[in-house]
Amino acid sequence: MNLNLDSAKDTLCKNILIYGYCKFENKGCAFSHHKPNVGQPPVSASSSSGYSGNSSPAEAKRKFNLNTPSFQPSNVQNITSKFAALSPKVKEIPVFVPSGGSGGAANTPNNGADANELLSQKKFNASTPSFMPAGFGSEYPSSPNTSGAGQPPNPYLTGNGHPASMAQSSGADVYYQQQAASYPLQYHLYAPAPPPRLTIPLPPHETNANSMFIPNDLRETLQKKNEATLQTLPRSNLPEHINIYHSLVPIDKSYDPKSKVWDVPSSLYKVFSSVDGNPYALRKIELNFPIINEAPFKTIKKWRSVKNANVTQLQEAFTSMAFGKSCLVVVYDYFPNSSTLIDHHKRIGTRTEPITEDLLWNYLVQLVNALMAIHAKGLAARSALDLTKIIVTNKNRIRLSNLAISDILNFEKDEEEISKSNRYFQGLQREDIKKLGRILLSLSTLTIPNTLRNNDTGELLRHLKTSSTISFSDEFIQVLTVLNEDTVEFDLDRFSQRYLTTRLFSTINNLEDSTDFMESQITTELENARLFRLLTKLNFIIDRPEAKDWTENSNKYIIKLFRDYIFFQHDEYGKPVVDLSRVLTNLNKLDAGIDEKFLLVSRDEKNCIIVSYKEIRDTIDSVFRNLTRD
């Protein structure tokens, strides 16, 4: 290595920069070992130019000079006054001065100027406050030494939940509890799809892991429903309590300021009951007239008595001032992740369910079933028969929702019409049949081009025969014609006997198949709790070396060897054995306590014992009883 000794003596040794000392300082190291004097005062701009001019030739040749002073503005106030005209608050901006320097001089008021001069020469000041993003919330609390009033919490940040009074504390560390963020569930990591080689049909004696549990799509659907049911909305401006209900979460997917059905502002929420803890759907309707007595709610008792599989159960109805004004509140059963028929089949930009004739027959059977139950109580569905009020709760399973609202909103008009005619409710029930026909016709027209869709019923029925993408049967066209006829008399029982008798068997068959499938899936998951309790006992017992009776000859050591026998086996190639069926088989044998004997070997292969599953089960029960007794 070619080294210029003349320039090396003026170059600071790198060992001094890195380690603070050089072990070759007195053993021939040619570099300088004198640390730079950081206590010298800063050099002004004029003197610095003279200094660079009068420097030695060796210093002039160097590319980096450690003694070069850092740049510092001489007058910050002049810069501030330059931009003072842009904003009236620019002059109020304080000048940044690093604080908290080390050493006793920095803490002495008389030596404040010397401390500032010392800090000004440091390239990196450890006392400079670091930037802390506000979005991290209380996981990174502010410095407890910070004085001044605390900043109010930001309601839009999920983790910023500490009160302002706590931030003013300067003597002790403050613990801020961070709220758990809501992340979408990783369904593909919970139960991954099998590799392609396992998707082919397997022989009867072979199986895969998916056949031991419920299907992935069903598990994902149920998990999404549970997630929607347990969803909360912290720091919202919604009321905390409405009567006995709390934890309001908006679930209405319509952003219209007014309901097109009732022509009044309306919204839908998911709530929890303080009485039974169950979730419910709460419909809020802003009233344009006061309700001063209980007369508008006289039909609520009848509606609560309607028990039908295709009708959303009504819980109660009342008025409330919790939203700041008088509102009508109607509470129904809650079905998570349900969608309306218009969202299920007609919503643009989403994946919609295709229309088929079998699906329409299925809808017709369910709607007729709901209407027969409602009409049998002397009631009418009215506004509930709308594409935006019929909800799809499961695959091809629909229910009428938002019942009894029209009876409350139109109470005065209904009283006047009833006083004029005794057949007023019969007319409302006949109107339900017409709405049923329009709903089926509206869904059927989704199979014809948009240019052919109009409001003329006769033309629509004709286009369904000639221009539809699917071939409707003559029987279905006849049903649409009968439902959309403008006749005064209509017998729903006779209609169902004539047109729906044969279709009922298909619906019943599908429901029974679905019931059998669900029952079979529940059967596969029935014993999961039993094996979980067994594993819990094992983990409570093993790995307690601090216990007085813990030795390699004790009963607990046998249980540990059994744990290793199940989960820490290796094959002949030294690879871990990851076989779920083997684990389930051994746990089932242990739980049953059979007399089958097998060999347990320690990991170092120095200890071995022949034992049966029954002996291990008795040992586990005995040790666990002693553990709970201590």
From Swiss-Prot:
GO terms for biological process: mRNA processing; nuclear-transcribed mRNA poly(A) tail shortening; postreplication repair. This is PAN2-PAN3 deadenylation complex subunit PAN3. GO terms for molecular function: ATP binding; poly(A) binding; zinc ion binding. Regulatory subunit of the poly(A)-nuclease (PAN) deadenylation complex, one of two cytoplasmic mRNA deadenylases involved in mRNA turnover. PAN specifically shortens poly(A) tails of RNA and the activity is stimulated by poly(A)-binding protein PAB1. PAN deadenylation is followed by rapid degradation of the shortened mRNA tails by the CCR4-NOT complex. Deadenylated mRNAs are then degraded by two alternative mechanisms, namely exosome-mediated 3'-5' exonucleolytic degradation, or deadenylation-dependent mRNA decaping and subsequent 5'-3' exonucleolytic degradation by XRN1. Residues 44-56 have a biased composition (Low complexity). Belongs to the protein kinase superfamily. PAN3 family. The keyword Metal-binding applies. It comes from Scheffersomyces stipitis (strain ATCC 58785 / CBS 6054 / NBRC 10063 / NRRL Y-11545). ATP binds at residues 283, 333-340, 388-389.
